[in-house]
Amino acid sequence: MLIDAHNHPNWHGFNAEKILRNMDEQGIDQMWLFSWEVPEDEYAPSYHAVLPPTGLGIPLEDVISVGRQAPDRFVMGYMPHPKRPDAIDRLKAAVEIHGIRLASELKVRLSFDDPDALRLYEFCGEQKLPITIHLDYPIDHGK
């Protein structure tokens, strides 16, 4: 089985139909779909070249919308920002209500050992949710 273990809904305009077609063309059996919850002060406007300009990052709603169109092919991921006071409650609800199976993607300007992050990681461990962490470096986002 070939798994694409890092992807996002609506990235470069790829909706469910385009993603599934691309998966079939490339022989990909399953894809992990990630949200990206990002504070406004961490979001570069250049991301609007590759994401819909309707908001910031990739909301859980987009993951659910695409993921539910082919639940046998998409594994849905969500990771709230660890500094949100309700981060654990939000992740727990996403798991219980929407079937989230991954804690993904953590891409924030925060130390790995931040106390709020550690609490969230501990919850993920208790829930047996794999965590993906995006390490970033300066790249051209298509300015």
Specify the residue positions occupied by each region the protein language model found:
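An N-terminally biased module of ancient metal coordination in phosphate/nucleic-acid-related enzymes
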Residues: 1-61, 92
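Active-site gating/metal-coordination segments in enzymes
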Residues: 46-143
